[in-house]
Amino acid sequence: MSKAKFERSKPHVNIGTIGHVDHGKTTLTAAITTVLAQAGGAEAFKYDEIDKAPEEKERGITINTAHVEYETANRHYAHVDCPGHADYVKNMITGAAQMDGAILVCSAADGPMPQTREHILLSSRVGVDHIVVFLNKADMVDDEELLELVEMEVRELLSEYNFPGDDIPVIKGSALVALENPTDEAATACIRELMDAVDSYIPTPERATDKPFLMPVEDVFTITGRGTVATGRVERGVLHVGDEVEVIGLTEERRKTVVTGIEMFRKLLDEAQAGDNIGALLRGIQRTDIERGQVLAQVGTINPHKKFVGQVYVLKKEEGGRHTPFFDGYRPQFYFRTTDVTGSIKLPEGMEMVMPGDHIDMEVELITEIAMDEGLRFAIREGGRTVGSGVVTSIIE
C-alpha cells in the first residue's frame, strides 16, 4: 500500500501522552496510529518502534522522545511520547517538543499514582492548559463503581492543579485491546471517542504569526548614511516597514523607534514574519543605543523584569551538569534568548540544597532587566556550560 500524503490544509496541533510509568502511554500512542491508519489518517506504529525513542539533544540535555504524526477528519497532529519519567520532566521544562494539549493516561486498575500527579503539576506550570483523560485498562476492572471512583479521583487531582476537573473529557477503554483488534468496531470505539474529544476539547493554538511582533537582537551594526541595523530571527508576529517598535531589556528605559527598512538574504522586504532571519533598519537609533540580548517588540506588548519564579531542571553529572549540589544564594548566569545575565537564586522554604537531577521551583533575581513573559525558557549556565534548564512560571517584578 502506498503511503497516503498528509493533507497540510488542516489545522496543526501538537499533543503528547502523559501519565505514570506502565499505565499505557506508549500502547495508547501505538493504538491511535493503528486505528487511524485504518481510515488512511496515519502510518501505524508498533509499540517497540515508539518505545525505543531516539535520543535528542535540546540545550545540551539528552531527552528520549518518540514523535508520531496522524490525522483525524478535522486536524493534523504531531504526537510526542517519552519512554521515561525523567524524559517527561526534561521535555516539558525545556520545551523540546511543544505540546498544545495532552492526553493523560491513567490505569483504571491502579488509579492516580505519583507521576500522574507530577505530570499534571508540570503541565500546569509550563502552560499545557488542556488535558483529555484516557482511563486505560478498563477491561481489567469488573466493578463499575470502582471505575467511577478512579474517574472521580483523577478529576479531583486535576482540579487541585487548577484544571477544570469537572469539565475535562474522560474516556474509558483499553489501548491494548484496540491495538490488537484494529478492525473491530467495539474494541476501537474508545480510540475514536478519545480522538473526537481531543479534536473538540483541545483548541487550535494561535499561530506564531498572529501574536504580537517580537525579535531577539542577535547583532547590531551601522550602515553609513542609512543608520543602525539590528539583526535576528523573528520569534513571533509580523513586522512591516513603517511599524513603530520598542527596544526592551538590559535597561529600565524603553526606547521607541520606527522600522524604516527590512532586509532578508540581502533583499529588501515589505514585511517579515515569525521564523524569518532579518535585519531591521531603525530610525534615530545610535549604534550604542541597542545591543545583543535586547528585543525589538510591538509597542506595549512585553515588559522588562528582574524577579521571577522559574520551574527548573538541574542537569545530572552524566549530562554535563554540576557534580555537587548548590545552595540558597547561588549566583549562576541565566541565558535568555541571546544573552547571559547573572542572577541569584532563592530556594523554597525548608529546602537546604538542590542536587543534580532535581527539578524545583526557584525564585530568581537578575542583576539587569530582561524582556520576559510567562512561559519564556532559559538555561542556567556556569562558566559557559549548561547546568540547568527552566521556564518562567510567574513574574514577581
UniProtKB/Swiss-Prot annotation:
Principal cellular location given in the protein's record: cytoplasm
Keywords on record: Cytoplasm, Elongation factor, GTP-binding, Hydrolase, Magnesium, Metal-binding, Nucleotide-binding, Protein biosynthesis
G1: annotated span: 19-26
Assembly with partners or alone: Monomer.
Spans annotated as G5: 174-176
Region of interest: G4: 136-139
Pfam family, one: GTP_EFTU_D2
GO cellular component: cytosol
Reactions catalysed: GTP + H2O = GDP + phosphate + H(+)
G2: annotated segments: 60-64
Keyword Nucleotide-binding included in the entry's annotation: yes
Protein name according to UniProt: Elongation factor Tu
